[in-house]
Amino acid sequence: MSNTYIIVGAGIAGIAAAEAIRKIDSQRPVIMFTAEHNLPYSRPMLTKTPFYSFDPDKWTIHSLEWFDANRIDLHMDEPVSAVDPSSKTVTSSRGVYHYDKLILATGAENFLPPITGIDSDMVFTIRRAEDIFDLKKVCRASAKAVVIGGGVIGLETAVELWRYGAGVTVLEAAPYLMTRQIDEEISGLIQKKLQGQIDVYTGVSIKAVEAPSAADSACVVLSDGRSFPCDLVIVACG
Protein backbone atom coordinates (compact mmCIF):
# COMPACT_ATOMS: atom_id res chain seq x y z
CA MET A 1 0.00 0.00 0.00
CA SER A 2 1.58 3.31 -1.08
CA ASN A 3 1.47 6.76 0.48
CA THR A 4 0.17 5.42 3.77
CA TYR A 5 0.14 7.30 7.06
CA ILE A 6 0.46 5.23 10.21
CA ILE A 7 -0.30 6.72 13.62
CA VAL A 8 0.72 4.74 16.69
CA GLY A 9 -1.37 5.92 19.62
CA ALA A 10 -4.99 7.03 19.76
CA GLY A 11 -4.94 9.60 22.53
CA ILE A 12 -5.46 13.34 22.07
CA ALA A 13 -2.19 13.72 20.13
CA GLY A 14 -2.91 10.81 17.80
CA ILE A 15 -6.45 12.00 17.10
CA ALA A 16 -5.23 15.57 16.50
CA ALA A 17 -2.68 14.21 14.03
CA ALA A 18 -5.37 12.27 12.16
CA GLU A 19 -7.62 15.33 12.03
CA ALA A 20 -4.77 17.48 10.73
CA ILE A 21 -3.91 14.94 8.03
CA ARG A 22 -7.48 14.82 6.83
CA LYS A 23 -7.61 18.62 6.56
CA ILE A 24 -4.84 18.58 3.96
CA ASP A 25 -5.11 15.08 2.53
CA SER A 26 -8.47 13.38 2.20
CA GLN A 27 -7.31 10.50 0.01
CA ARG A 28 -4.25 8.73 1.33
CA PRO A 29 -4.79 5.82 3.72
CA VAL A 30 -4.48 6.49 7.43
CA ILE A 31 -4.02 3.59 9.83
CA MET A 32 -4.22 4.20 13.57
CA PHE A 33 -3.20 1.71 16.26
CA THR A 34 -4.23 1.60 19.90
CA ALA A 35 -3.47 -1.09 22.45
CA GLU A 36 -6.72 -0.34 24.26
CA HIS A 37 -10.05 -2.10 23.78
CA ASN A 38 -12.09 1.10 23.66
CA LEU A 39 -12.67 3.78 21.10
CA PRO A 40 -10.29 6.70 21.72
CA TYR A 41 -11.48 8.65 24.76
CA SER A 42 -10.59 11.69 26.82
CA ARG A 43 -7.89 10.37 29.15
CA PRO A 44 -8.15 13.17 31.76
CA MET A 45 -11.63 11.85 32.59
CA LEU A 46 -10.08 8.72 34.13
CA THR A 47 -9.73 10.53 37.45
CA LYS A 48 -12.69 12.88 37.06
CA THR A 49 -15.59 10.44 37.09
CA PRO A 50 -17.13 8.33 39.88
CA PHE A 51 -15.63 4.84 40.05
CA TYR A 52 -19.05 3.24 40.56
CA SER A 53 -20.33 4.55 37.20
CA PHE A 54 -17.04 4.40 35.32
CA ASP A 55 -17.60 4.00 31.57
CA PRO A 56 -15.01 5.27 29.06
CA ASP A 57 -17.57 4.98 26.26
CA LYS A 58 -19.19 8.11 27.68
CA TRP A 59 -16.15 10.23 26.78
CA THR A 60 -15.18 8.99 23.34
CA ILE A 61 -13.50 11.66 21.23
CA HIS A 62 -15.06 10.43 17.98
CA SER A 63 -17.56 7.72 17.12
CA LEU A 64 -16.73 4.70 14.99
CA GLU A 65 -18.80 6.33 12.25
CA TRP A 66 -16.44 9.32 12.29
CA PHE A 67 -13.44 7.07 11.66
CA ASP A 68 -15.29 5.33 8.83
CA ALA A 69 -16.42 8.61 7.26
CA ASN A 70 -12.88 9.97 7.35
CA ARG A 71 -11.40 6.74 6.04
CA ILE A 72 -9.23 6.22 9.11
CA ASP A 73 -8.56 2.53 9.68
CA LEU A 74 -8.68 2.21 13.47
CA HIS A 75 -7.01 -0.91 14.88
CA MET A 76 -8.18 -1.31 18.49
CA ASP A 77 -6.66 -3.80 20.92
CA GLU A 78 -3.62 -4.07 18.65
CA PRO A 79 -0.38 -2.93 20.31
CA VAL A 80 2.62 -2.09 18.16
CA SER A 81 5.80 -3.82 19.31
CA ALA A 82 8.41 -2.72 16.76
CA VAL A 83 9.23 -0.10 14.15
CA ASP A 84 11.72 -0.75 11.35
CA PRO A 85 12.71 2.56 9.68
CA SER A 86 14.86 0.81 7.06
CA SER A 87 11.90 -1.13 5.65
CA LYS A 88 9.33 1.45 6.76
CA THR A 89 7.22 -1.09 8.60
CA VAL A 90 5.58 -1.43 11.98
CA THR A 91 4.94 -4.76 13.64
CA SER A 92 1.78 -5.17 15.70
CA SER A 93 0.25 -8.08 17.55
CA ARG A 94 -1.57 -9.02 14.35
CA GLY A 95 0.83 -8.34 11.51
CA VAL A 96 3.35 -6.15 9.70
CA TYR A 97 2.25 -2.90 8.05
CA HIS A 98 4.09 -0.63 5.62
CA TYR A 99 4.08 3.13 6.03
CA ASP A 100 5.29 6.13 4.07
CA LYS A 101 4.86 8.55 6.96
CA LEU A 102 4.86 7.50 10.60
CA ILE A 103 3.64 9.41 13.65
CA LEU A 104 4.42 8.09 17.12
CA ALA A 105 1.87 9.50 19.56
CA THR A 106 2.06 7.02 22.42
CA GLY A 107 2.51 9.51 25.24
CA ALA A 108 4.42 8.74 28.43
CA GLU A 109 4.04 5.95 30.94
CA ASN A 110 3.54 6.60 34.65
CA PHE A 111 6.64 7.31 36.71
CA LEU A 112 7.31 4.77 39.44
CA PRO A 113 9.67 6.09 42.13
CA PRO A 114 12.53 3.80 43.20
CA ILE A 115 10.81 2.46 46.31
CA THR A 116 11.18 -1.08 47.60
CA GLY A 117 8.05 -3.07 46.76
CA ILE A 118 6.73 -0.59 44.21
CA ASP A 119 6.34 -3.44 41.70
CA SER A 120 3.88 -5.33 43.92
CA ASP A 121 0.59 -6.53 42.44
CA MET A 122 -1.16 -4.37 45.02
CA VAL A 123 0.36 -1.18 43.61
CA PHE A 124 -1.59 0.53 40.82
CA THR A 125 -1.17 3.46 38.47
CA ILE A 126 -3.85 5.18 36.41
CA ARG A 127 -3.01 5.59 32.75
CA ARG A 128 -5.70 3.64 30.88
CA ALA A 129 -9.34 2.68 31.29
CA GLU A 130 -8.27 -0.87 32.10
CA ASP A 131 -6.42 0.48 35.16
CA ILE A 132 -9.71 1.70 36.65
CA PHE A 133 -11.36 -1.65 36.01
CA ASP A 134 -8.41 -3.37 37.75
CA LEU A 135 -8.77 -1.00 40.70
CA LYS A 136 -12.48 -1.70 41.03
CA LYS A 137 -11.77 -5.43 41.31
CA VAL A 138 -9.84 -4.93 44.55
CA CYS A 139 -11.32 -1.70 45.90
CA ARG A 140 -14.38 -2.69 47.87
CA ALA A 141 -16.33 0.05 49.61
CA SER A 142 -14.58 -0.48 52.95
CA ALA A 143 -11.06 -0.76 51.54
CA LYS A 144 -8.11 1.25 52.80
CA ALA A 145 -6.19 2.99 50.03
CA VAL A 146 -2.92 4.91 50.09
CA VAL A 147 -2.27 7.39 47.29
CA ILE A 148 1.39 8.27 46.77
CA GLY A 149 1.48 11.74 45.29
CA GLY A 150 -0.42 14.90 46.17
CA GLY A 151 -0.65 16.53 42.76
CA VAL A 152 -3.75 16.95 40.61
CA ILE A 153 -4.03 13.29 39.57
CA GLY A 154 -3.32 12.02 43.06
CA LEU A 155 -5.95 14.23 44.67
CA GLU A 156 -8.57 13.55 42.02
CA THR A 157 -7.99 9.83 42.48
CA ALA A 158 -8.14 10.16 46.26
CA VAL A 159 -11.47 11.99 46.10
CA GLU A 160 -13.03 9.42 43.76
CA LEU A 161 -11.82 6.57 45.99
CA TRP A 162 -13.32 8.33 49.01
CA ARG A 163 -16.63 8.81 47.16
CA TYR A 164 -16.50 5.11 46.34
CA GLY A 165 -16.45 4.39 50.07
CA ALA A 166 -12.75 3.70 50.64
CA GLY A 167 -10.70 5.11 53.47
CA VAL A 168 -7.98 7.16 51.81
CA THR A 169 -4.57 8.45 52.87
CA VAL A 170 -2.49 10.75 50.65
CA LEU A 171 1.29 10.83 51.08
CA GLU A 172 3.21 13.72 49.49
CA ALA A 173 6.97 14.30 49.57
CA ALA A 174 6.70 18.07 49.03
CA PRO A 175 5.90 20.42 51.92
CA TYR A 176 2.37 21.02 50.62
CA LEU A 177 -0.11 19.68 48.07
CA MET A 178 -0.10 20.59 44.36
CA THR A 179 3.22 22.46 44.51
CA ARG A 180 3.42 22.66 40.71
CA GLN A 181 0.04 24.34 40.36
CA ILE A 182 -0.64 26.56 43.38
CA ASP A 183 1.04 28.35 46.26
CA GLU A 184 1.16 27.18 49.85
CA GLU A 185 -1.75 29.36 51.00
CA ILE A 186 -4.20 27.99 48.44
CA SER A 187 -2.88 24.48 49.06
CA GLY A 188 -3.66 24.92 52.73
CA LEU A 189 -7.27 25.73 51.89
CA ILE A 190 -7.55 22.55 49.83
CA GLN A 191 -6.04 20.46 52.60
CA LYS A 192 -8.45 22.02 55.10
CA LYS A 193 -11.35 21.12 52.79
CA LEU A 194 -10.20 17.50 52.79
CA GLN A 195 -10.06 17.25 56.58
CA GLY A 196 -12.38 14.61 57.96
CA GLN A 197 -12.60 12.91 54.58
CA ILE A 198 -9.06 12.13 53.42
CA ASP A 199 -5.94 11.91 55.60
CA VAL A 200 -3.08 13.96 54.16
CA TYR A 201 0.59 13.78 55.12
CA THR A 202 3.05 16.16 53.46
CA GLY A 203 6.83 16.36 53.64
CA VAL A 204 7.16 12.60 54.00
CA SER A 205 9.68 10.16 52.56
CA ILE A 206 8.50 6.68 51.64
CA LYS A 207 10.85 3.82 52.42
CA ALA A 208 8.95 0.79 51.14
CA VAL A 209 5.68 -0.79 50.15
CA GLU A 210 5.34 -4.07 51.99
CA ALA A 211 2.94 -6.44 50.25
CA PRO A 212 3.70 -10.13 50.97
CA SER A 213 0.98 -11.42 48.64
CA ALA A 214 -2.33 -10.46 47.08
CA ALA A 215 -4.07 -12.30 49.92
CA ASP A 216 -2.41 -10.13 52.57
CA SER A 217 -2.83 -6.45 53.36
CA ALA A 218 -0.14 -4.09 52.16
CA CYS A 219 1.67 -1.51 54.25
CA VAL A 220 3.36 1.71 53.18
CA VAL A 221 6.36 2.41 55.42
CA LEU A 222 7.88 5.87 55.80
CA SER A 223 11.55 6.62 56.44
CA ASP A 224 10.70 7.86 59.93
CA GLY A 225 9.16 4.49 60.83
CA ARG A 226 5.49 5.36 60.53
CA SER A 227 3.42 2.86 58.60
CA PHE A 228 0.04 2.87 56.87
CA PRO A 229 -1.70 -0.51 56.46
CA CYS A 230 -3.85 -0.65 53.34
CA ASP A 231 -5.53 -2.87 50.79
CA LEU A 232 -4.13 -1.09 47.76
CA VAL A 233 -1.64 1.59 46.79
CA ILE A 234 -2.05 4.05 43.92
CA VAL A 235 1.05 5.82 42.64
CA ALA A 236 0.42 9.26 41.12
CA CYS A 237 3.90 10.77 40.86
CA GLY A 238 3.80 11.96 37.26
Predicted regions located by residue number:
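FAD-binding core/adjacent interface of flavoenzyme oxidoreductases
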Residues: 1-6, 60-146, 203-209, 219-237
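Beta1-alpha1 glycine-rich phosphate/pyrophosphate-binding loop at the start
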Residues: 2-73, 160-182
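Glycine-rich Rossmann-fold phosphate-binding loop(s) that bind the pyrophosphate
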Residues: 9-13, 127, 148-151
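Hydrophobic alpha-helical segments typical of transmembrane helices
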Residues: 17, 45, 62-63, 76, ...
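Short, glycine/charged-enriched secondary-structure capping and boundary segments
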Residues: 21-23, 45-48, 89-90, 116-120, ...
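Rossmann-like dinucleotide-binding cores of NAD(P)H-dependent redox enzymes
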Residues: 144, 153-208
